[in-house]
């Protein structure tokens, strides 16, 4: 009887075998991070549907939840570079799109 009660307690106690960092979303984010880390330095076309802008960007870095992109801008007598971040959630939902060369 005690063995049965111990097994029942294990089934009801979800914190024992539950790992927050092993959920489906975390596995997806880790996969995307590994994918984008291989693409660092490559050029891509970034399309944002909410602001209706598209830019040619360079992938700078990949982190746990987002990637860092940069693009150059030019003026009459100046030139610069701007960095921006895009979350994996925006890429997965279709709000943003990144087409790598």
From Swiss-Prot:
Signal peptide range? none
Q: Which domain of life is it from?
A: Viruses
Indicate what this protein is called per its UniProt record: Gene 33 protein
The taxonomic lineage of its organism, from the top, reads: Viruses, Duplodnaviria, Heunggongvirae, Uroviricota, Caudoviricetes
